[in-house]
């Protein structure tokens, strides 16, 4: 008898039904490393805010992981906010 995947896996599969979310997930996975919101948005042709919304949903589902890091060489006060970066979640 076949068994169904755990509910968490089914929920993750359901999240990928959205074409924008699926494209963003595919881009992050294909990149093989960290991807910024701007990079992901540009790659799939959507606005940054929409990309951020979908990427954060993928993080909440456990499909992606997020971290913060300054991308430029500047440090200290006035260096700006660290970028939120996404990568495929460890299995």
Protein language model annotation of sequence segments:
Residues 55-56:
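Short, hydrophobic-biased segments on the C-terminal half of alpha helices
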């Amino acid at each position: 008898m076949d068994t169904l995947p755990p509910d968490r896996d089914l929920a993750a599969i359901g999240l990928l039904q959205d074409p924008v979310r699926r494209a963003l997930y595919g881009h992050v996975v294909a990149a093989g490393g960290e991807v910024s919101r701007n990079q992901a948005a540009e790659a799939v042709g959507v606005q940054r805010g929409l990309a951020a919304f979908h990427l954060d949903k993928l993080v909440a589902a456990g499909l992606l992981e997020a971290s913060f890091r300054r991308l430029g060489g500047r440090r200290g006060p006035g260096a700006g906010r660290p970028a939120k970066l996404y990568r495929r979640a460890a299995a």
